[in-house]
């Protein structure tokens, strides 16, 4: 989320034992600058890329920055475009960089991403507080159902992040109980001093 994680938030998340993902709604140069601010503190950091043709350049520059995590971030992660950018990143990245892709909501999509060689899948079609997928596309899957289905299609060593639908702390517990290895939050930490969003 572009109003949640830039360097200031990523630094605090890393200090707390997590990893912040610098959003892709910045220019490539600004995103690199935010990544370097976190790295300068000696902390882990991730960065998001999209799937259109200009994102190949973004991905290449992010790989050169030696980020700890690259997230192929799209509303529907079971597509040819997602496959193409994953293949591109896999050829260029080092073994030290973890590759995550999503978002997905089915076992079939999990198998698709696992076959492409991702380390982590990101689960969630429409549950986020600012997500418009359900309104615009008319599709969405309840988060718990999505997690349980995706888990069935995962390869043994591939991890799963639950992305979206966290309104209460208990939602984190439910996601973990459904098999998620980690949980991605947005609105829960938006509007804090560390977030880049403007306070109105």
Task: Put a short name on every predicted segment.
Residues 4-163, 167-200:
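Alpha/beta enzyme core
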